[in-house]
C-alpha cells in the first residue's frame, strides 16, 4: 500500500483554501456581461477560448494534492449546477468561495464547524423559499428570448433562435445544437416523428431529384422481427394493394427474397411500397416501435403478443398523412393515432424520465418524448473559425439549458439582484446558538458576492458603492453591468431562471459546508523516483552492450 501524507486542522484548511481560491479566481472573471474570456491550452489543435464557468473549472488540475482536492470540490459545485440547471456555474463557484472564505475565518477564530454548517443550511433553506416567492412564470416568446439572450452572454440572435425553436416544437420538444457547414447560424424544424433509418434500397425512391421516397396517406406495417420469406408477407401485401394506398414496412430487417420481391413490384408499378429498418436496438427498439404504433394508430405485430405476420389484417396497420424517406432518415407526419393514447404514452415516458438515474437513458427518453409531442428543432451554428464555432456552440447549449430551466420554475431578476432581494428571507431563519447565528450571517454576506463580482468585472465601478445603491432600491431595480446604468432590470431583459439561481446557492452551500467541517486531508506521498521515466536499455540485443 502506498504511504500517505496527512494534513490536520489549520494546515489542511489553509491548503484547501488555496486550491478553492485558485479555481474560483480563474472562473469568476467570466461572470456577467463584462466578464472576460479564458484561454485553455489544448495538447492538439488550437487553444479554446471560453466564457463558460464550468468549462474553465473542468480544465483545472493543480500540482499540490491537497490544494487540488479543494479545487476539485469547487469544480463539483460548477459541474452539479451545470447538470441540474445548465447554467449558473460561475455564480455557484463565486458563492462557494465566499461561504468557505467567511466560514473559515470563524472556524479559525474558534467557532464550531458543525454549528456553522447547520446555520448555513437553515439560511439557504429560507433564501430558497424567498427566491420561489419572488419568482414569476414565463410563457411569452419575448420572455423566453430574454432568458436565452442573457445566458448566451447577451447575444440577442441566439435568444431569438431559441425562443423560435421552443415556439415551434413546444417546451417538451427536442432542440439540438449542431455545427453548420457555412457561416450562417440558422434554425431548422423537423415536423412530426423522425428516426435515423433510411430506405433499404434506392429503388424505393419516388423523387429522383431529391433522392427521396415520398408516400401520401400510407398504411404502415410495424413488425419486430426480420422478414426474409415472402410467404409470410404476401397476405398483408395483397390486402394493402387492394386498398389502393401506399405501404410503408418497418421491420427489424428485410432481406433476400422478400426485399427483392418488393423492389421488383415497386419498379413494375404493381405496388406502392417502401421498406425501412426499425430504429434503435434491443429494448429501446421495442419501445420505439410501440411509440410509432401509438402515433400512427397501428399495432406492433409481435409473436410475443401472439400476433403473426401471415395472419395480419388491415386493422393492424398504422396510418399517417405522409411519410418521406431519404437514405438516412424517415419522417412520419400527421400520425393518425388516438390523441388520448398518445397523451397517455407521453405521460408514461415523463414518468420514466423522472425515475431515470442515467444521463444517457434520460437523453434517449427525452428524444422519444419530443418525437411523440411534436417534432425536433435543430440549431445549426455557423462561424468563421473552428475556435469561434466551439465557443458559440457552448454558449448556445448554455442558453438552451437555462431557457428550459426558466420554463420549468420561472424567472427572477438577474444581475445578482435576486440574491440581494432574497436576503430578507434570512429574517425567518432560526438559530439555536451563537455559532448557528454566525452561519446565517455568513450566507447573508455571501449573497452579496455575485453582484460585487459582476461589478468588479466591469473594471470601472466600485462594487461596495453599487451594492449599497441596489440595497436602497426595491424589487427589480438594479445595476445593468452591460450599459453601466441603474434601471428596472426585468424591463431591460436582465433575468435569470429561478432554477439556476436556486441550484447555484444550494450546491455552493453544500460543498462549502463539507469543506468547513473537514479536519484532515490525506494524500499519497509523492515519490520523485516513481515519477522519473525508465532508463532506456543499454545497447541492442546481441550487441554485447555496445551503443
Swiss-Prot record:
The molecular function terms in GO held by this entry are: ATP binding; ATP-dependent protein folding chaperone; isomerase activity; unfolded protein binding
Which compartment or compartments is the protein found in? Cytoplasm
Q: Which InterPro entries match?
A: Chaperonin_Cpn60_CS, Cpn60/GroEL, Cpn60/GroEL/TCP-1, GroEL-like_apical_dom_sf, GROEL-like_equatorial_sf, TCP-1-like_intermed_sf
| Enzyme class (EC, first level) | isomerase
Q: What GO biological process terms does the UniProt entry carry, in alphabetical order?
A: protein refolding
Per UniProt, ATP binds at: 30-33, 51, 87-91, 415, 496
E.C. designation(s): 5.6.1.7
At the top level, the lineage of the source is: Bacteria
Annotated Pfam families: Cpn60_TCP1 (PF00118)
Q: According to the UniProt entry, which residue ranges have a biased composition of type Gly residues?
A: 538-547
Q: Which UniProt keywords apply?
A: ATP-binding, Chaperone, Cytoplasm, Isomerase, Nucleotide-binding
Specify where it is mainly localized.
cytoplasm
Task: Please list the reactions this protein catalyses.
Answer: ATP + H2O + a folded polypeptide = ADP + phosphate + an unfolded polypeptide
UniProt GO cellular component terms: cytoplasm
Disordered, as annotated region: 528-547
Family label: Belongs to the chaperonin (HSP60) family.
| Matching HAMAP family | CH60 (MF_00600)
Instruction: Say what the protein does.
Output: Together with its co-chaperonin GroES, plays an essential role in assisting protein folding. The GroEL-GroES system forms a nano-cage that allows encapsulation of the non-native substrate proteins and provides a physical environment optimized to promote and accelerate protein folding.
How does this polypeptide assemble, per the annotation? Forms a cylinder of 14 subunits composed of two heptameric rings stacked back-to-back. Interacts with the co-chaperonin GroES.
Descriptive protein name: Chaperonin GroEL
Organism in which the protein naturally occurs: Chlorobium chlorochromatii (strain CaD3)
